[in-house]
Amino acid sequence: MTPSQIIVLATPVFFVLIALELVWGLARGRNTYRLADAVNSIGLGMLSQISAVFTRLLRVGIYTAVYSSVALFPDATFWTSWAGWLLALVFYDFCYYWLHRAGHEVAVFWAAHVVHHQSQDYNLSTALRQTSSGALFGWIFYLPMAVAGVPPLVFGVVALVDLLYQFWVHTEHVGKLGWFDRWFCSPSNHRVHHAVNERYLDRNYGGILVVWDRLFGSFQEEDERCIYGTRKPLNSWDPLWANAEVYATLLRDSWRTRHWGDKLRVWIKPPGWQPADLAAAEPAPPFQLDAVQTFGPPMSRVVQGFGVVQFALLLAGVAAFLWTADRLPLAQAAVWLAVLTASLWALGAVLQGRMGMLEALMIESAALATATSALGMIDLHRIFKPLTMVIAIIFIATYAASARAGGQNGSSTRLGDRWLVLAALLACLAGDVFLMFPGYFIPGLVAFLIGHLFYIAAFRLGVPWLPSRRALGMTLGIGGTMYTVLWFGGLPPALRIPVAAYVVVIALMAAQAIGRAAVLRPGPGGRAAMGVAVGAGFFMLSDSVLALNRFVAPLPMAQFWVLATYYTAQVLIVRNVLIDRNPA
């Protein structure tokens, strides 16, 4: 049985305990759960587990290579005895202590570990909140076990035991436990670890044993109320940003500081350290415990219900993936990783209010359409491909109708604007359907050409025709170059004129979108216009990949890249095209 399968089997136990903690807290008037926070924490755990299918190869592979080369005492008989198992577990916990401590005292390790601390709640769902990048460097701290001769199988088992033990200590409903607190990581000890109080900061690192903290001077007793989270709150339900936030800050500081030594020190100094030049220009504000505010955008009951249903479906999808992941080809596993990641991101965006439910459904349907095409699941593909555009059409219709009912009189709510976009989407829907069947390439090409003409007309509203000559020259140049490649790469003579017409029209569509963004950029609609322009660029990229694969040479995973870029284009256009506050 694989580690992923063990996690799947343990998941029902996790949720039973979470449910019991929730009921207990409600009954005692001390509920420690919030829906969005719990979904976000568990979602980050899902993302951690599905990405571990790939990153685990790094950790286990390096460990096995070192063990095979330099193990000093590789006696399997000893290590699989009760004394060997116990020693290996203590050895692992000792290494974990130093990894965990580095995760708080060295910025690059904190960038990975911070995910576990971002929740401002402390409950059993917080235990499942795990990083997706910890394996990139964490393996370094366990190499002493490989050198000592702990077999990889024993290492894997004790690592899982150490991880599972730490689940139960993430609760506010278990008080101090007397002698147990003096030896082991307990709820009281670990509450201190998660707190941002000054006296609690960077304390109690032990995974199973807290004696390491007592030995190395990092122990702190719980003696005042804990405030949870990080000193620089994430303030987001975005699982991708949760993993990238600190890395982005380190990259920015490393790039902006003038001194070459500081460009390295940024990564190895304690979290929050700033080079002198950056600290002088942009000093970090002092942390004030009494100013901490809990992040929690309001949600309607409909959104809460949507979130619960989506979460349940994603949980089932993640469980199915983890159960079979080790038997899947790497490319196939990567496709499903992309689907689940996109869906987790969309769910977080809905819960935060950054995206509507229809937009999230469009993204999820697009991801499934892409995956089913790439993996040859034709029957399912023929459902999800048209469904994606149907959802987009419904979204545009309802968005425009609600904006109009709300009394907005800007150009984005004009009837013509709505119908032009709807006509473009209907044409794209027809093109999608045609291209699902052999022998209908020309009808599909014509349908998309019509769709681009409607998009051009929609992008024209509120701005001049083709307002940027530079954009026009760029898109026509790219289109002309691609057409030349197709011509010499084997484009059939019967398709040369239709494809030429299509290339010109899509280049004009992209040029109009880019020019529109240039005109609107200084105003409130500039960001949305830029989203439309980027979407138009992805449209050109998608069609280029499709044409190269069809007429020049087969490309690896072509269907995945064609549809991934196509749906990225449609999502960006659909989400942004009606957001334009400039007056008509």
Residue ranges, per PLM feature:
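Short, hydrophobic transmembrane alpha-helix segments
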Residues: 1-5, 27, 68-72, 323-327, ...
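Transmembrane helix interruption/hinge and helix-loop junction motifs
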Residues: 3, 147-157, 325-328, 376-378, ...
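Membrane-interface helix-loop junction between the first two transmembrane segments
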Residues: 19-39, 376-384
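Transmembrane alpha-helical segments that form the membrane-embedded catalytic/substrate-channel core
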Residues: 15-23, 90-105, 160-175, 186-192, ...
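Polytopic alpha-helical membrane-helix bundles and their juxtamembrane interface segments
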Residues: 357-584
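Substrate-recognition/cap regions that form aromatic- and gly/pro-loop-enriched pockets
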Residues: 297-356
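Membrane-embedded catalytic scaffold of the fatty acid hydroxylase/desaturase
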Residues: 46-58, 79-233
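Cytosolic/stromal cytosol-facing helical appendages immediately following the last transmembrane segment
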Residues: 121, 172-310, 347-348
